[in-house]
Amino acid sequence: MHLLPVITAVALIYTPLASAVPSSSNPQFPAALLTESNSAALPTQEWHSPRLWTRLRNSIIETIWRVPSQQRHPSRIKSPASSRKAPASIRARYGDDVVLRFTIQSQSDIQALVEASNILFLDIWASTDEWVDIRLAKDVVPSLLGLLPSSLKAASVPVIHDLAQAVYESYPQPSSSTPNPHRAFSPSIRLSSEAQNIFFQDYQPLSVMTPWMRLLASMFSTHVSLISLGTSYEGRDITAFRIGTHPMNPDNPFGQRKTIIITGGSHAREWISVSTVNYVAYSLITGYGKSKAITKLIEEFDWVLVPTMNPDGYVYTWETDRLWRKNRQENNLQFCPGVDLDRTWGFEWDGTDSRSNPCSEDFAGDGPFGGTEAQRISQWARNQTMNNNVTFIGFLDLHSYSQQILYPYSYSCNNIPPTLENLEELAIGISRAIRRTDNEHYDVSSACQGSVNSGKKKQGPALKRMESAGGSALDWFYHDLHVRYAYQLKLRDKGSYGFLLPRSNIIPTGKEVYNAVLEFGKFLLGKEAPSVDWDAEFQVSDPSRPISPDNEYHDRDVEHEALQQLDDEDGEADSHWVLRTQRS
């Protein structure tokens, strides 16, 4: 039986299609977004020209920071031609915004970008040990460059030339409703080549996703239940799958339950994280009883999968602003709502610098657990451990983008996690599993830092990561809830599309994380893992490509680690993939 098409079809039948739209006041199916003539159906809100503010800001910057006025010529970044033009309502919201990538070489480069971004209230999209992506309007580019040292002025390239057009093209298209029979299917069930994953052919709004989750839970009630971790600021349920052999019985006779929690959608605009959690959930649910590996994992562990920890923000990205990041709660500034749900957790909460500004993208709230959803989820987790005989042993927090696997701590590089070696070992295994899927490379490092590489030579010590901060879910689950294996996975891509990842990446990214979850579970099983042929369960995006043996990658890793040791000793060796950590 082709389960997913049936589930999706029923979910769609019982869900008014109008609710899947980008406008709560003018409900239409998303296809209405796709033509210029229907541009009125696109997300709209009152919009005021920023020109006066831009001129005032530029004047202040020019006076205080002595930016030469001749630098204020309009940016010459050109937009690529497109046969489908973004309508006026999208242009009104995103204007002439672009995304620039800066190559960083030193800690001073990072500090300069942080300070300039805070001054100009810019949106930092992503950062790694080699680059930083920043969103800004074209006419702000000269102001930014004027605040940066000479080393950075020539170190930037446009990643997205026309953000408004990119946003427009990221919404579901009419063609996406026609399934492609050649698309990949569930990694946990070997269906026929004609199987079609309708649900994963495109991103889904909450109004479609929630009925789909309910239907899936009702069809597999022997090992699945739908639970609420609390309610959001606007009153929506924070819904999750609980998967296990006895999820409906909190007083089970089998003793304490080891539980793994996988979350997505903390930042509303990171749609790929939401789809990926759903993909992994579907694979686990439908694989039980058919896949030996999945059956073993569900019998040994309980799994809690939360597609979106930020349902209000997620809905807002569909109805109003595709690039909204925070939740939607009110704060002291009515015109700057929202709290960054990955900066508001209680452990080492930090409300200084830009995190104290309600208009900042990383506003941490007025205090620890100032974000409603983070507070509710933490209360649920505490209650599970204290009253429901649950021990959380694993935490995977999915984000985008930049293809990284990060482990604690995020708040500081000065304190080393007591289980560092185990965290590193499993992180390397996860990266290896992802690489076996489709040769995509995910870097591994501490969440607080990276290392700078130039060419083939190691250049200097590890750097503090630009995005590192206190109050992260990663640190709270690891330190306060004592989850031994806690990670943040930053999914595809490495910046070509950023948060606007095309729908064609949904299934490949889902497969990568599915294989990562297999590796995660295999590692936690320990001595019991050899009883299952894990290689038989691994999937690749290209079925014609044979799966490389796990030991092949292990041998490569050993070789690279040996090379890095030589590099540390005499500075001559080169390592392409090395885990660098700061141990003091």
From Swiss-Prot:
**Signal peptide region:** 1-20
Residues carrying covalently attached carbohydrate according to the record: N383, N389
What the record notes about the co-factor is: Binds 1 zinc ion per subunit.
Broad class of the protein's primary localization: other
Q: List the disulfide bonds.
A: C336-C359
Keyword GTP-binding assigned to the entry: answer is no
Propeptide span(s): 21-174
Subcellular compartments:
Vacuole; Secreted
Cofactors: Zn(2+)
GO BP term, example: proteolysis
Spell out the GO cellular component terms annotated for this protein, sorted alphabetically and separated by semicolons. extracellular region; vacuole
Q: What is this protein called?
A: Inactive metallocarboxypeptidase ECM14
The function of this protein is: Inactive carboxypeptidase that may play a role in cell wall organization and biogenesis.
**UniProt: substrate binding residues:** H267, A268, R269, E270, R325, D342, R343, S400, Y401
Fetch the InterPro entries from UniProt. Answer: Peptidase_M14
Protein family according to the UniProt entry: Belongs to the peptidase M14 family.
Alphabetical list of Pfam families matching this protein:
Peptidase_M14 (PF00246)
Which terms in the Gene Ontology molecular function aspect does this entry carry? zinc ion binding
The superkingdom listed in its UniProt entry is: Eukaryota
| Domain Peptidase M14 intervals | 202-524
The alphabetical list of record keywords is:
Cell wall biogenesis/degradation, Disulfide bond, Glycoprotein, Metal-binding, Secreted, Signal, Vacuole, Zinc
Instruction: State whether keyword Protease applies.
Output: no
Q: Which residues bind Zn(2+)?
A: H267, E270, H399
Region annotation (Disordered) maps to 564-584
> Which CDD domains does this entry report, sorted A to Z?
M14_CP_A-B_like
